[in-house]
């Protein structure tokens, strides 16, 4: 059975206000094949239960921490933020071609 996505509606409003993007934009990018990486959160000590999506959206790469709720079969998205280093790492060849 496939997992669905969930997120805080309040957090989504804040992100839409501050970043002009929301969780639905991230979910659409993932479902459209723009998931670049899925791994454990790099800071396992501080965030032992979190995972991290690396997602391409428009001209940037966003980091999306999430937790897995196996009981509800949900991936709960915590937040998302653009990451300059990830953008350079994953999109460097595309930028050189332009």
PLM region spans:
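Ribonuclease/tRNase effector modules and their secretory precursors
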Residues: 1-98
């Amino acid at each position: 059975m496939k997992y669905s996505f969930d997120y805080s509606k309040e957090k989504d409003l804040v992100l839409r206000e501050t970043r002009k993007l929301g969780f639905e934009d991230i979910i659409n990018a993932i479902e459209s094949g723009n998931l670049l990486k899925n791994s454990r959160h790099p800071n396992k000590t501080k965030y032992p239960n979190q995972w991290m999506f690396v997602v391409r959206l428009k001209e940037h790469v966003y980091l999306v921490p999430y937790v897995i709720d196996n009981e509800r079969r949900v991936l709960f998205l915590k937040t998302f933020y653009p990451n300059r280093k990830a953008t350079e790492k994953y999109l460097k060849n595309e930028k050189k071609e332009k």
